[in-house]
């Protein structure tokens, strides 16, 4: 029964994409900004780690490491789990109990703790092992120093508030994770 639900979700997603209705509103400007953020190694502490470090394009946006855990931005510190692929994460439902299957379904991360792409996008940025930033203010300061900060302001508007800027960052990351680049539906079964 679970397989049927997953197939239905994939089919519905491909219908949405083919009709020109992406799963995330925002269009190509936000997606392009999100891609820059996703690949920016200056957003970690210390710098050198990006979202793409653990979600490698060459591995289907999954962890390049084939072991159960991966090293984060700080040398010698390891995450609790290997990074899962972000492909098709835009179509994962919020965590809920399915009475018919008598099991929990959905949610992002291995344990389903995150209800949305925007929420999920912020977790690694503030995780002391993954990207090592202490707080949203630290992330905001780094984003303000990037060459694409002007583009972010054009899309979202100016803000001096770290919480708002962090929300803009996670929204752009969610837009990129909802893009056709990450959700291509190119399998022969997607036709």
What are the roles of these predicted feature ranges?
Residues 19-191:
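Periplasmic c-type cytochrome electron-transfer domains
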Residues 1-3:
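N-terminal secretory signal peptides that target proteins for export/translocation
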Residues 5-14:
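Sec-dependent N-terminal signal peptides
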């Amino acid at each position: 029964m679970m397989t049927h639900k997953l197939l239905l979700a994939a089919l519905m997603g491909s219908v949405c994409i083919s009709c020109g209705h992406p799963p995330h509103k925002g269009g190509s400007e936000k997606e392009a900004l999100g891609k820059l953020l996703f690949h920016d190694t200056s957003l970690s502490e210390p710098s050198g780690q990006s979202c793409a470090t653990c979600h490698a394009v060459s591995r289907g946006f999954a962890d390049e490491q084939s072991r159960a855990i991966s090293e984060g931005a700080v040398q010698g510190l390891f995450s609790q789990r290997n990074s899962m692929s972000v492909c098709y994460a835009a179509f994962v439902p919020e965590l809920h109990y399915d009475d018919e299957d008598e099991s929990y379904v959905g949610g992002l991360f291995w344990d389903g703790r995150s209800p949305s792409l925007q929420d999920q996008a912020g977790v690694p940025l503030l995780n002391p092992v993954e990207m090592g930033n202490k707080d949203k203010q630290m992330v905001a300061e780094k984003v303000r120093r990037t060459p694409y900060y002007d583009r972010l302001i054009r899309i979202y508007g100016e803000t001096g508030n770290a919480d708002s800027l962090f929300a803009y960052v996670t929204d752009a990351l969610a837009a990129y994770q909802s893009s056709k680049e990450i959700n291509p539906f190119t399998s022969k079964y997607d036709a």
